[in-house]
From Swiss-Prot:
Keyword Chloroplast: no
Organism, as annotated: Methanothrix thermoacetophila (strain DSM 6194 / JCM 14653 / NBRC 101360 / PT)
Taxonomic lineage of the native organism: Archaea, Methanobacteriati, Methanobacteriota, Stenosarchaea group, Methanomicrobia
GN (gene name): eno
Annotated metabolic or biological route of this protein: Carbohydrate degradation; glycolysis; pyruvate from D-glyceraldehyde 3-phosphate: step 4/5
Protein name (Swiss-Prot/TrEMBL): Enolase
Binding site for (2R)-2-phosphoglycerate: Q162, K333, R362, S363, K384
SMART domains: Enolase_C, Enolase_N
């Protein structure tokens, strides 16, 4: 059966930080798909390139060039193609762009089309997106890794570490995990408000609190106090996203008002894992520190060490990390690589080498909930899409609740008391 692409149209919309982004619509005879593209605040040097307009309009952040590339360049080329040929569609766009980082047409233009095509295909076949992309084996719900306390580039405080996350590995289902996390989030808010005043419950880009805290251990202690209140000290574990490139300069790292060498930073993480129930650390070093990543992974064999800026969902960099045993997990962001098929290829490579996969949002998001479907389709162990607050974050969590409901008794949960 051939379901031809009949029309493609892009427009400029606003993301959750009030900046422009690309939204793409795709039509077939009997289906429709709409996709909106996210954007990051802390971005890796090696990511696929977002095309921005420059100039005065929207402080240079407009995306009309990318929109025109969809409407005038990409769209006409894809009209008449089979919407089910996802890899063929993606490959044509890659070839049309002709650059390693998609800087000609723009990764924001290409991803918008790629994801909208996938949605249109699912719609045309009368299937949910997770089932279309993942097949009959797409039944596992990921463990949510919720960023409840913000620092770094995601907040206006003095914390070096960018994200402090809670992960309900001990829940029996995704819905129970989300409930536990939401209860803990609100308990944390009450604790922070009582200690620091109302200003402490201002939130960062991803919905996590941004209190006037400057020390890593103070942030972790606040979260542990919240877990004591909710009683989920066994069910919920902790994760960190250091985003260490943001506090790296001239061979050293500035953490908690201290200047640390790479070796001292390794010791810092090891001590934190000994003291707190931390089971995951993302980007513990700057984006080219493959050797330091490998040393930490070796020293903490029971901890999930995740590469984000290290890999930027790029196959060549993932392969290097595999050879060097730099991490044991991949953070997968669709807009880092720019097409649906390349993202799935990256996940497949990770799984073949016994990596875990953590699907992730960006700090500037939209109401698009496709990330939830992608996480189930890929079979990801984890999903990171912010605190259980702000609608652009909860859009993903709520979609996972719907998927769990639709799957019924066939639904499974990636946690199941692994660290309890």
């Amino acid at each position: 059966m051939s379901l031809e692409i009949e029309k493609i149209h892009a427009r400029e919309i606003l993301d959750s930080r009030g900046n422009p982004t690309v939204e793409v619509d795709v039509w077939t005879c009997c289906g429709f798909g709409r996709a909106a593209v996210p954007s990051g605040a802390s971005t890796g040097t090696y990511e696929a390139l977002e095309l921005r307009d420059g100039g005065d309009r929207y402080d240079g952040k407009g995306v009309l060039k990318a929109v025109r590339n969809v409407n005038e360049v990409i769209g006409p080329k894809l009209i008449g193609m089979d919407v089910i040929d996802q890899r063929g569609v993606d490959q044509i766009m890659i070839e049309m762009d002709g650059t390693p980082n998609k800087s000609n047409l723009g990764a924001n233009a290409i991803l918008g089309v790629s994801l909208a095509v996938a949605k249109a295909a699912a719609s045309s076949l009368g299937m949910p997106l997770y089932r279309y992309l993942g097949g009959v084996s797409a039944t596992r719900l990921p463990v949510p890794s919720l960023n409840v306390l913000n620092g770094g580039k995601h907040a206006g405080n003095d914390l070096s570490i960018q994200e402090f996350m809670i992960e309900p590995w001990g829940a029996d289902s995704f819905s129970e995990a989300l409930r536990m996390a939401a209860e803990t989030y609100h308990a944390l808010g009450r604790i922070l408000r009582g200690k620091y005043g109302n200003v402490a419950t201002n939130v960062g880009f991803e919905g996590g609190y941004a209190p006037p805290i400057s020390k890593t251990r103070d942030a972790l202690d606040a979260i542990m106090a919240a877990l004591d209140v909710t009683g989920y000290t066994e069910e919920i574990k902790l994760g960190l996203d250091s985003a260490a490139s943001s506090f790296y300069l001239d061979g050293g790292y500035s953490v908690d008002d201290n200047r640390l060498s790479p070796g001292e930073l390794i010791d810092f993480y090891v001590e934190l894992v000994k003291t707190y129930p931390i089971v995951l650390i993302e980007d513990p070093f700057e984006e080219n520190a493959f050797e330091e990543f490998a040393e930490l992974t070796k020293k903490l064999p029971d901890t999930i060490i995740v590469g984000d800026d290290l890999y930027v969902t790029n196959m060549a960099r993932i392969e290097k990390g595999i050879r060097m045993r730099s991490t044991n997990a991949l953070l997968l962001k669709l807009n880092q690589i720019g097409t649906v098929s390349e993202a799935f290829d990256a996940a497949t490579l990770a799984y073949r080498n016994s990596f875990k996969v953590m699907v992730s949002h960006r700090s500037a998001e939209t109401e698009d909930s496709a990330l939830a479907d992608v996480s189930v389709a890929i079979g990801a162990e984890l999903i990171k899409t912010g605190a259980p607050a702000r609608s652009e974050r909860n859009a993903k969590y709520n979609q996972l609740l719907r998927i769990q409901e639709a799957l019924g008794s066939s639904a499974s949960y990636a946690g199941r008391r692994r660290w309890s």
